[in-house]
């Protein structure tokens, strides 16, 4: 935290997910994957299951309950659109600067930029590739 000059008193870790609806989400972790990716659905019968967990899922609007934000960074492995749908009121009201990953699905760049522009027409966009290889595109949004 010190490296990024972040005030630790303003950071909290929450064991929950963010999406367009509140509820619970089941994740299955398989031990044949060295990265232990969580899966929303159980893998096929041939895969050895290492762990299953159920986690709370919130909308960002409900979690923040009207508290202001100035910056939103999201690299949530393809769940960027559901996260943004659950943050609609927060984005409209506070117009935070945003750094949104747009490389998980081919349609991400267009759909995410279009959705953000629908919410706040004043948003401007910058696209940056952070890795030397193709991919890892981040869409920066600011008013």
What is the role of each PLM region?
Residues 1-143:
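Phosphate/nucleotide-binding beta-alpha loop and adjacent structural elements of enzyme active sites
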